[in-house]
């Protein structure tokens, strides 16, 4: 928006392309504050680059001309990753999440699913790596559900330790949800990185995630905010064999 205004004033020159990623097009506070500026940007800017088809549709609904919209996918450099051999889940099932500890990551739903897994007698361990404003809330849930022997929150870890923990994991979990303020994911890079090294992924039918993961073909998706469906999926995964696992990787 600022760049478009500066170009009109002759301060800068050239075409203006704007990327739309996540909170900038989903948070109610952001949209309430910036929608008038976005409307001006749609007229003054040259190209809008949403990172998903979902966001492209939202831009059109907000009044952006379709000819100015081009979906620009995010990605990861596959040369940085080495695929691991197929790893059939062991006992206990090793689940891992690597994420900033915020509401939209859905880790509170994951912990509720863990409570259900424990009640069903599923043998599992769950590591949540990361820091963020929801840390205390998540730790309280773990204590409330008496999951201290099943769920671990080591906090921030350097990259080499994260890699070692990922290598040990059977499944990468990111149960993203829409925040109370409307904040949503774009398409999480953490999922892309897990898929790049061949770690099975379980996530949700949230935002642009279904554009990355085709359920039962390149991972598994469940409805967001549905701890029972998540527990069902993880319990089923704990018994998967190599023949069923290989096509999904």
Tell me the role of every PLM-derived stretch.
Residues 191, 196, 200-203:
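Short hydrophobic beta-strand element within catalytic cores of glycosyltransferases
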Residues 203-216, 220-221:
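Short acidic/histidine- and often glycine-rich active-site loop of Leloir-type glycosyltransferases
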Residues 49, 87-105, 111-114, 127:
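Conserved donor-binding/catalytic core segment of Leloir-type glycosyltransferases
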Residues 137-160:
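Nucleotide-activated donor-binding/catalytic signature segment of Leloir-type glycosyltransferases, i.e.
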Residues 215-216, 220-227, 235-242:
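Conserved acidic donor-binding segment of nucleotide-sugar-dependent glycosyltransferases
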Residues 167-182, 199:
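Acidic donor-binding loop of glycosyltransferase active sites
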Residues 156-157, 164-169:
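Short alpha-helical donor nucleotide-sugar binding micro-motif in glycosyltransferases
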Residues 54, 75:
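Carbohydrate-associated surface elements
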């Amino acid at each position: 928006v600022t760049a478009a205004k500066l170009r009109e004033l002759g301060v800068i020159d050239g075409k203006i392309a704007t990327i739309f990623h996540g909170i900038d097009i989903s948070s109610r506070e952001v949209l309430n504050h910036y929608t008038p500026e976005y409307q001006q940007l749609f007229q003054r800017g040259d190209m809008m680059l949403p990172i998903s088809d979902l966001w492209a549709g939202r831009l059109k609904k907000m009044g952006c001309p379709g000819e100015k919209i081009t979906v620009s996918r995010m990605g990861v450099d596959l040369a940085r990753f080495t695929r691991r051999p197929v790893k059939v889940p062991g006992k206990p099932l090793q689940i891992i999440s690597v994420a900033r500890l915020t509401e939209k990551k859905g880790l509170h739903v994951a912990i509720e699913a863990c409570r259900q897994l424990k009640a069903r007698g599923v043998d599992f361990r769950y590591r949540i790596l990361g820091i963020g404003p929801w840390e205390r809330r998540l730790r309280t849930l773990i204590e409330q559900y008496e999951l201290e022997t099943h769920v671990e929150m080591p906090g921030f870890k350097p990259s080499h330790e994260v890699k070692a923990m990922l290598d040990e994991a059977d499944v990468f979990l990111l149960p993203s949800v829409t925040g109370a303020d409307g904040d949503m994911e774009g398409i999480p890079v953490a999922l892309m990185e897990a898929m790049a090294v061949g770690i099975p992924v379980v996530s949700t039918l949230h935002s642009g995630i279904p554009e990355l993961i085709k359920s039962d073909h390149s991972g598994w998706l469940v409805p967001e905010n549905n701890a029972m469906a998540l527990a069902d999926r993880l319990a089923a995964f704990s018994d998967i064999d190599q023949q069923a696992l290989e096509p999904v990787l």
